[in-house]
Amino acid sequence: MQVGNKGVALQTCHRHTLNKKNFVSSPISVLSLLLLLLCCCCQFADSMRLVVQRVKSASVTVDGKVISSIGPGAMALVGLHEDDTKDDLEFCCKKLLACKLWENDNGSLWRHGVKQRNLEVLCVSQFTLYGTLTKKHQPDYKRSMKAIPAQEMYDAFLGMLRNGYEAEKIFDGQFGAMMDVSLVNDGPMTIVI
């Protein structure tokens, strides 16, 4: 926090500054708040990413052989950033197991997660989630975690999921392999964590 002219408190976030004086009364202040929120969210853009899909079924095939498959449940594409830590793994593990993508027994939407519904989870490691396009429109994956530490982190993430739920309900693809991933998206329902 900084103090501007006339002693008014200013909230800063990277390049944006928000003046707290007369905040509610000014339409420009709403825009300032949105910029501040966007900027603060950008701080978390370089942490582990999950693309979670509610599925009726999903499977992973490697070299023509199905190595994992689930019925109804959640499929998560898992992207690791080069700066990810154990805290990022724990955060995403809790979010994945707690996210409420299903209705309850009364039909109320967004009330149950995989645990309440006793469903399965399929995780697929996907370093391309941190891909960006270069000026020549070619993919660049320099922000993705390198293979050896990424495999260790991914295995740790799977271990956390198995410890936080039922181990036999957590499935995964094959780290580093070329995989064919098939799914029937239920809804469709897809969120990014």
Model-derived segments and spans:
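Short intrinsically disordered, low-complexity coil segments enriched in acidic
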Residues: M1-G4, C39
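Acidic, Ala/Val/Gly-enriched low-complexity intrinsically disordered segments
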Residues: V3, V8-A9, V24, V30
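Intrinsic-disorder-associated, low-complexity terminal segments enriched in Asp/Asn/His/Tyr and depleted
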Residues: N5, H14-N22
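Cysteine-centered motifs
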Residues: C13, C39-C42
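Short polybasic linear motifs
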Residues: L33-L36
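N-terminal, polar/charged subdomain of small-to-medium soluble alpha/beta proteins
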Residues: D46-K136, D140, I148, E152-I193
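An anionic oxygen-ligand recognition environment, strongly enriched in 2H phosphoesterase
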Residues: R143
